[in-house]
């Protein structure tokens, strides 16, 4: 495994931290410090991260790696249980969700039951023996007669011609991953068509697809290995920790949370997974519609239909053409409009209001409206950075086009355009963190002292990220000559470095001072 296929976490070396004295955090290189457990004391200055030690924590796997691993497990089980056929062991492992230890245990307890349940009634012999006869064999599908050598049967002895068997297996493979559990074509037969039978009967292309589905089952059934969720990515990642907090980096370039394993979510630092789940549920939950209704409508006192006020007058009518009952009432106290006049303060006022139960209802509505406004504040900013992140991702993918324009206009070296990719990658990282920082901020205790630090660091990161975005998006048409290009390049390069420091400061602030903050 190459260094590129390994991602590394970092732990703080306390001794080196003491030696570093007041060394600035800005000059410290680190990846995922945001989720390290730090003790926060508001009366003490935050310590430097000091020297960072590396720990290998996850591994990127390609198809060859998966094949080697799965084949190694098959061979180990084969040797332990003295089963002669790897195809039989493969079928047993798939039945046991690739749990080697559990398979061996169950096989030792009751091998006959396990094998029957797995569709391998005889691990010593998988296929029926061809008996040479003077006559032909009748295929049970097409009912045509064939020489025995042109037919095939599993140990269950349900014999079919090779063309029919081939067609049956290819259809199963075309239907998807469940083909690895394909049973014998005979009705109600539970014997599984093993790997060697597929290899013998179908084309090499179809057999390769079948093997790919076996590798897929190896990943899908393994809690420590997951496919990278990026569209079109062929890699998987193994993580040896059950609840990994840091993001993982796939060789395809996508960075994401291993636990969530969701392309749309990606890397949700600084939020914990549970917080993201809660936020996404809130965003899609119908209860939010109920909150809006409570905050912005009142129910007709007669038929209880929700009514939204669209004018200044307190005289409300529950419109029949909108499904109402026609009842006329006061918006403030919800009493009949016939009881309102000069004695109650006039038609545009109501001095009954404070004495009515409507006051209690309106207090609840006011609280709901306040909560809704707070949610919308954070949600709009979450969405804004989410959209900006998509733009940054597109800019990163199109950086080579801007590079070609620069090379052709200013006759510079290819190395002089490296800053473009660095800037877009930094923008992408910043936007992703800013997106989820508003989720984190929404659930942060409104009265906590740490909130001020959080919002201060968030504001700094947001401001300088926007400045870098503005610098990067400058039109090349405005760069009149080589000197103008060099000046622009220096500005973008410097701001890329600056925004990285602000991102690092934000990450360190969350890790060092906010991880123990009470979350509502």
From Swiss-Prot:
Disulfide bonds: none annotated. Zn(2+) 1 binds at residues 139, 142, 161, 164. One of its GO terms (biological process) is sorocarp stalk cell differentiation. A zinc finger (IBR-type) spans 208-273. CDD domains: BRcat_RBR_ANKIB1, Rcat_RBR_ARI7-like, RING-HC_RBR_TRIAD1. Residues 1-42 have a biased composition (Acidic residues). Zn(2+) 5 binds at residues 300, 303, 318, 325. Keywords: Metal-binding, Repeat, Transferase, Ubl conjugation pathway, Zinc, Zinc-finger. A zinc finger (RING-type) spans 139-189, 300-333. The keyword Zinc applies. Zn(2+) 3 binds at residues 228, 233, 250, 252. Zn(2+) 4 binds at residues 257, 260, 268, 273. The active site is at 313. Disruption phenotype: Prestalk cell numbers are reduced in slugs and these prestalk cells do not localize to the tip of slugs. Development terminates at the finger or slug stage, and these slugs do not phototax, possibly because the tip region does not properly form. Its EC number is 2.3.2.31. Pathway: Protein modification; protein ubiquitination. It catalyses: [E2 ubiquitin-conjugating enzyme]-S-ubiquitinyl-L-cysteine + [acceptor protein]-L-lysine = [E2 ubiquitin-conjugating enzyme]-L-cysteine + [acceptor protein]-N(6)-ubiquitinyl-L-lysine. It comes from the Eukaryota. One of its GO terms (molecular function) is zinc ion binding. Might act as an E3 ubiquitin-protein ligase. Appears to be required for normal cell-type proportioning and cell sorting during multicellular development. In addition to being necessary for a normal percentage of prestalk cells and the organization of the slug, rbrA is also necessary for spore cell viability. Members of the RBR family are atypical E3 ligases. They interact with the E2 conjugating enzyme UBE2L3 and function like HECT-type E3 enzymes: they bind E2s via the first RING domain, but require an obligate trans-thiolation step during the ubiquitin transfer, requiring a conserved cysteine residue in the second RING domain. This is Probable E3 ubiquitin-protein ligase rbrA. It comes from Dictyostelium discoideum. The gene is rbrA.
């Amino acid at each position: 495994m190459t260094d590129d296929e390994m991602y590394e976490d970092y732990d703080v070396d306390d001794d080196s931290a003491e030696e570093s004295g007041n060394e600035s955090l800005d000059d410290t290189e680190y990846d995922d410090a945001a989720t390290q457990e730090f003790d926060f004391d508001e009366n003490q200055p935050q310590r430097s991260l000091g020297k960072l030690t590396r720990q290998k924590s996850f591994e990127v796997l390609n198809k060859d790696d998966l094949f080697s691993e799965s084949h190694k497990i098959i061979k180990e089980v084969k040797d332990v249980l003295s089963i002669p056929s790897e195809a039989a062991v493969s079928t047993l492992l798939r039945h046991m969700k690739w749990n080697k230890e559990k398979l061996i245990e169950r096989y030792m307890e009751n091998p006959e039951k396990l094998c029957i349940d797995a569709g391998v009634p005889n691990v010593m012999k998988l296929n029926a023996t061809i008996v040479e006869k003077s006559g032909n064999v009748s295929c049970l599908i097409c009912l045509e007669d064939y020489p025995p050598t042109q037919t095939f049967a599993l140990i269950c002895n349900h014999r079919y011609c090779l063309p029919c068997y081939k067609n049956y297996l290819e259809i199963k493979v075309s239907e998807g991953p469940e083909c690895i559990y394909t049973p014998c074509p005979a009705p109600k037969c539970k014997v599984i068509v093993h790997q060697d039978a597929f290899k013998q009967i179908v084309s090499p292309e179809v057999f390769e697809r079948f093997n790919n589905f076996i590798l897929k089952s190896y990943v899908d059934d393994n809690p420590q290995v997951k496919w990278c969720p990026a569209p079109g990515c062929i890699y998987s990642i193994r993580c040896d920790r059950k609840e990994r907090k840091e993001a993982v980096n796939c060789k395809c370039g996508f960075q994401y949370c291993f636990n969530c394993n969701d392309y749309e979510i990606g890397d949700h630092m600084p939020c914990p997974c549970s917080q993201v789940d809660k936020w996404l549920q809130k965003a899609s939950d119908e209860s939010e519609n109920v909150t809006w209704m409570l905050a912005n409508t009142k129910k007709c006192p007669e038929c209880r239909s929700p009514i939204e006020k669209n004018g200044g007058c307190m005289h409300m009518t529950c419109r029949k053409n909108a499904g109402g009952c026609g009842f006329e009432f006061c918006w403030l106290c919800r009493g009949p409009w016939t009881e309102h006049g000069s004695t109650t303060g006039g038609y545009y006022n109501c001095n009954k209001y404070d004495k009515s139960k409507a006051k209690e209802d309106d207090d609840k509505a006011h609280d709901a409206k306040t909560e809704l406004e707070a949610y919308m504040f954070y949600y709009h900013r979450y969405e804004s950075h989410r959209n900006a992140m998509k733009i940054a991702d597109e800019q990163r993918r199109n950086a080579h086009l801007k590079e070609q324009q620069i090379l052709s206009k200013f006759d510079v070296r290819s190395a002089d355009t490296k800053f473009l990719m660095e800037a877009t990658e930094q923008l992408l990282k910043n936007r992703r963190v800013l997106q989820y920082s508003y989720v984190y901020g929404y659930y942060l205790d409104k009265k906590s002292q740490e909130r001020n630090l959080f919002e201060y660091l968030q504001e700094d990161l947001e401001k300088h990220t926007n400045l870098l975005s503005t610098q990067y998006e400058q039109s090349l048409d405005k760069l009149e000559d080589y000197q103008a290009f060099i000046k622009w390049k220096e500005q973008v390069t410097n701001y890329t470095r600056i925004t990285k420091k602000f991102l690092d400061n934000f990450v360190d602030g969350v890790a060092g001072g906010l991880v123990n903050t009470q979350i509502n």
